Amino acid sequence: GSSSPGVAPADNTGPRAAPSSPSQLCAVCGDTAACQHYGVRTCEGCKGFFKRTVQKGSKYVCLAEKSCPVDKRRRNRCQFCWFQKCLAVGMVKEVVRTDSLKGRRGRLPSKPKCPQESPPSPPISLITALVRAHVDTSPDFANLDYSQYREPSPLEPPMSDLEVIQQFYSLLTTSIDMIKLFAEKVPGYGDLCPEDREQLFASARLELFVLRLAYRTALEDTKLTFSNGSVLDKRQCQRSFGDWLHAVLDFSNTSYSMDIDISTFACLCALTLITDRHGLKEPHRVEQVQMKIIGCLRGHMPGGGGSSSGAAPLQRVLGALPELRSLSVKASQRIFYLKLEDLVPAPPLIENMFRASLPF
């Protein structure tokens, strides 16, 4: 498979030809590995990830069953399983130089400062809080609901227009309820004035619906997984979503090719919510929260921390935000059309979307 741009530069280096023996492959992901790092033959990508994880004391969360595939192409998709694989093949944490040892080629500091005293654990980091907010409002992939799933079949009578729209409204409202919960868990959101919270949420809810749905949709998969755990065949959604579905799937392919990890994705969701919107009462306070999240994302991304090498991946991730806005407009138009058709009374949440003024 082709390597993902901007995520692990080490993937693009090294000879094109297959290594002559398995001993030249990375024990973690199978990529080309020139030599040993931290006790095991590993590639530069896995070495760098292991080192960063240990030095920063990062804690990861698996969204699935802690058995995600870890190979050259997919290792970035679950950092929890990637790190566990590093440990499983024998990479040694104790060999990684911490900040106090940097530049000393692994020699111990001349006077260790009370080695038996461990420093107090820092308060929960912003990035951890954002990942937790995302995980807590995402479906449990071990317990998905296939009760409404149907593959198109000539033997199966199609659903009526009425049923299709009812199903669509139900999926949309439960998803938006989950997005509301996500918003409330984003650090800093609750400190904003009530009017600005409402404005930010109303502006971002359809963008977040698209973003989260796209992230859960694998490239070659024929299924869509919604926030409440319901799984549908993509073709089941064609009638209710209309042309909007194609735009969502195109965006899904784009975001899949970026191959962003869960921490980056959680930051992207937060930045979709916490951003400058028309009519904010205290835009400066919103900007303060936004800058904290951007700083957090910059520090997390490979080559981040203000170095020029981190600019390209960061800009590419942030470049998804304007596209989300146009997809949100398409969504509003589609929902407005279904509401005008009036086959099914729109639930209050949908009705209220258009109460003040048309959002497109």
UniProtKB/Swiss-Prot annotation:
Residues 1-21 are annotated as: Disordered. It is found in: Nucleus. GO terms for cellular component: nucleus; transcription regulator complex. The keyword Acetylation does not apply. A zinc finger (NR C4-type) spans 26-46, 62-86. CDD domains: NR_DBD_NGFI-B (cd06969), NR_LBD_DHR38_like (cd07072). One of its GO terms (biological process) is cellular response to corticotropin-releasing hormone stimulus. SUPFAM superfamilies: Glucocorticoid receptor-like (DNA-binding domain), Nuclear receptor ligand-binding domain. Keywords: DNA-binding, Metal-binding, Nucleus, Receptor, Transcription, Transcription regulation, Zinc, Zinc-finger. It holds the Pfam family zf-C4. PROSITE patterns: NR_LBD, NUCLEAR_REC_DBD_1, NUCLEAR_REC_DBD_2. Gene3D superfamilies: Erythroid Transcription Factor GATA-1, subunit A (3.30.50.10), Retinoid X Receptor (1.10.565.10). Its main location: nucleus. Residues 122-357 form the NR LBD domain. One of its GO terms (molecular function) is nuclear glucocorticoid receptor binding. The keyword Transcription applies. It comes from the Eukaryota. Residues 23-98 bind DNA. Forms a heterodimer with USP. Belongs to the nuclear hormone receptor family. NR4 subfamily. PANTHER family: NUCLEAR HORMONE RECEPTOR, NUCLEAR HORMONE RECEPTOR HR38-RELATED. This is Probable nuclear hormone receptor HR38.
